[in-house]
């Protein structure tokens, strides 16, 4: 666990540079599950990397499924974190072999929820009760109209917006998660949202609450709007990739 802890501490130092806070949270949660697993199954507080065998991750998988009663999606995320730390340790020469190199598991095929045109219009025109709800709706709709994820919106600066010679506005940047470049044309609906947040600060959305808070609020907003789908912030990216791109002829 000392190696896992060092890896997690390194991740924390890279938040906002090339890693997101959510990634750090995921590795932190994995480490806590590993600590509980070692205590419950091995009666130890740590284990040397050289002692790891494929049976370790197989037992960890079963532990997460039975003892922790986690969903398959969550289990796969935690297994991925453990596999990655061991792989990096092997590549860095910290351990002589990778005991998990041949380990395979079945990942779930997620159902990608997205809003249709009617649901987007309902959300746009809903009379929401509080300023906080209206702000979170704007954040979500901006993601719907641009495909930009939560982590990248959190660091979105006004200087990333540029107008071309035809008068069209574009936003460019590098994704926090992958460091890949993105270029997105700003549709009129997205520009309309931006106009409400010109407050003289460097960042477009300087009020960004924690993602868990946003998702909880979106759940309540969906109920108020009569939208029966499970609304999370990530649904915004899927909505852009489906409904918005089709509506605007974006490939």
Where are these predicted regions, by residue range?
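Short, polar N-cap/turn motifs at the start of nucleic acid-interacting alpha helices
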Residues: 160-166, 228-229, 249-251
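Short basic/aromatic active-site micro-motif
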Residues: 52, 135-137, 211-212, 228-248
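Short, aromatic/basic-rich helix-turn unit that serves as a nucleic-acid recognition element
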Residues: 2-31
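N-terminal DNA-binding recognition helix of tyrosine site-specific recombinases/integrases
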Residues: 21-22, 30-40, 55-58, 66-101, ...
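C-terminal catalytic core of tyrosine-transesterase DNA break-rejoin enzymes
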Residues: 141, 145-152, 220, 237-251
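Basic, Lys/Arg- and aromatic-enriched nucleic-acid-binding interface segment
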Residues: 72, 76-78, 95, 99-150, ...
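A Lys/Arg-rich helix-loop hairpin that forms a DNA/phosphate-binding surface
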Residues: 1-2, 22-25, 38-62, 206, ...
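C-terminal catalytic core of Y-nucleophile DNA break-rejoin enzymes
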Residues: 175-220
């Amino acid at each position: 666990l000392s190696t896992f802890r060092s890896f997690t501490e390194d991740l924390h130092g890279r938040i906002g540079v090339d890693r997101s806070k959510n990634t750090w949270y995921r590795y932190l949660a994995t480490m806590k599950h590993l600590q509980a697993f070692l205590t419950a199954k091995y009666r130890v507080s740590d284990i040397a990397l050289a002692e790891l065998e494929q049976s370790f991750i197989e037992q960890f998988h079963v532990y997460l499924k039975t003892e922790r009663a986690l969903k398959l999606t969550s289990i796969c995320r935690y297994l991925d974190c453990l596999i990655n730390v061991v792989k990096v340790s092997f590549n860095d020469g910290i351990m002589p072999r990778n005991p998990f190199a041949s380990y395979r598991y079945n990942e779930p095929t997620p159902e990608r929820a997205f809003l249709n045109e009617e649901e987007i219009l309902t959300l746009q025109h809903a009379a929401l009760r509080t300023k906080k709800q209206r702000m979170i709706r704007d954040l979500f709709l901006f993601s719907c109209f641009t495909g930009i994820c939560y982590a990248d919106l959190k660091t979105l600066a006004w200087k990333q917006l540029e107008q071309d010679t035809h008068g069209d506005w574009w936003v460019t940047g590098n994704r926090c998660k992958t460091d890949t470049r993105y270029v997105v044309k700003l549709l009129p609906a997205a520009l309309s949202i931006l106009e409400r947040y010109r407050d003289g600060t460097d960042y477009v959305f300087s009020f960004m609450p924690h993602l868990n808070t946003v998702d909880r609020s979106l759940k309540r907003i969906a109920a108020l709007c009569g939208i029966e789908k499970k609304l999370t912030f990530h649904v915004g990216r899927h909505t852009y990739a489906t409904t918005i791109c089709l509506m605007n002829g974006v490939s």
